[in-house]
Amino acid sequence: MTANVPMINSHSAERRVVRTLVVDDSVVVRTVIERILNADPHYSVAHKTSNAEQALGYLADHVVDLVLLDIELPGQSGLAALPQILRKNPSVKVAILSGKCEEGSAAAVEALALGASDILSKPGSGSFGEQFPQALIDRLNRLFDERPAVPSMQRHVTSPSPDNASAPLACIGIGASTGGIHALGQLFEGLAAPLGVPVLLTQHLPASFTVYFAQQLARMTSLRVKVAETGDLLQPDTVYVAPGDANIQLRRSLHGRAMVLLNPERTASGNLPGVDPMFASMADIFGAGAAGIVLTGMGRDGTSGARDIVAAGGWIVAQDEASSVVWGMPGSVVGAGLTCAVMEPLGMMNFVARRGKVAA
């Protein structure tokens, strides 16, 4: 393994330095990561440690912006330590850097559900190639660069009111990306009673994650959860999860019922699955009875579809900036003036249910 770190292109010139804690039991990995991050002007390794106990001790007295956390550690595991890290510093971003969190694994989905901001694959010992430093910086930049230009007056949480829904609630659509699994846990945790309507969910995840994700989600809620399939007739109090290789769209069955029609075409923004086609299809089928929820995530997926829902008489709720891992998707719909409320996930589902019943 070479000690040289390739030149890294970092595109955010005015962002403040991200103070980082590296937690890995390999001295080689800790050294390589430190060299990579310190070679970039936007990152600084504040501390390195080999186990979770020392990391928690450091965080008791110090504040960092980012924790790079391995899963397999001596003593307490990284997964066991993750909730404790977030309790000590709720605003910190934790990226799992592990060779044991393969794409689609149960450990990866569990880490995301526990609050990890991202999952990064760590090369095996001695195999840190020339591509890894830039790939690492690029992934971390996505966590810290995404701040759309939204007027400051629109960044505040709006006071949610259940008034002014123009039609009874018929369907809820949820879109999420980075940080979304943890936000979904909070969202469903706050649900006090059955909804009485179907829920469509698009979370940006590869297809290999879908089964584990649906299983994890089923443990978060009393609602029925299934991976959406073409031909599914929408049932109330059922969550239909978009598979990682298709968009959820809807059509009417021969008997007039709303039915799932999966579409494998990638959206114009490059997302698959995409929130935009799901929202647009909800607007077509349910009109003013459609309600959309936009949770934390990078990019602007969901804004075009949210515009379709609002144009059809429906309404949109977005996650607030303070509770978002990345305020890209929700910030975009807020900036476009499409939201009736901006709030943390815990109260969203009850707010949506109350607002829909007021219209009824």
Predicted features, each with a name:
Residues 1-22, 26-42, 48, 53-68, ...:
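Conserved acid/base catalytic micro-environments in cytosolic active-site loops
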